[in-house]
Amino acid sequence: MPRSRINGNFIDKTSSIVANILLRIIPTTSGEKEAFTYYRDGMSAQSEGNYAEALQNYYEATRPEIDPYDRSYILYNIGLIHTSNGEHTKALEYYFRALERNPFLPQAFNNMAVICHYRGEQAIRQGDSEIAEAWSDQAAEYWKQAIALTPGNYIEAHNWLKITRRFE
């Protein structure tokens, strides 16, 4: 049974009904409808913390989805789950793949920067200042890209860039 039929709260049910109506009246291919259904079910599972189910739905959504923009959000959400699971290398891979299809995802750049910053902090704790500096430099580059796409957002990152003298 599709997840959209088992959601318990009123807002989820209402959103599912509206989405189903839109799927019927907007001219889309069966592949696009299938991809959207899997994507919607993946988002629902992800919001409830059911990451394995969400991943399964997102992977299924990538099969029929051919639109690069829509596919970028599926890949981005897969990256989010891998980040939440502490699988940073996999997360970075999916953020990169999302950005290949849609280079205007500041949140992907931000999340990549957060992972790099975290790895830099780990290197500091391990006493490897050279590796820490490399990770921090990479974090700075990603944050600059996120800020360039959405000036006024990512204020903490902007402040970190200024404090560490990485902002130009």
Curated annotation (Swiss-Prot):
Cellular localization per UniProt: Plastid, Chloroplast thylakoid membrane
InterPro entries: PSI_Ycf3_assembly, TPR-like_helical_dom_sf, TPR_rpt, Ycf3/AcsC/BcsC/TPR_MFPF
Residues forming coiled coils: none
GO cellular component terms, semicolon-separated: chloroplast thylakoid membrane
Keywords carried by this UniProt record: Chloroplast, Membrane, Photosynthesis, Plastid, Repeat, Thylakoid, TPR repeat
A GO BP annotation: photosynthesis
Top-rank lineage group of the source organism: Eukaryota
TPR repeat boundaries on the chain: 35-68, 72-105, 120-153
Keyword Chloroplast listed: yes
Gene3D superfamilies: Tetratricopeptide repeat domain (1.25.40.10)
Keyword Chloroplast attached: yes
One Pfam family, short name: TPR_1
Membrane-related topology note: Peripheral membrane protein
Function, as annotated: Essential for the assembly of the photosystem I (PSI) complex. May act as a chaperone-like factor to guide the assembly of the PSI subunits.
Record-stated family: Belongs to the Ycf3 family.
Protein name stated in the entry: Photosystem I assembly protein Ycf3
Source organism of this protein record: Liriodendron tulipifera
Encoding gene, per UniProt annotation: ycf3
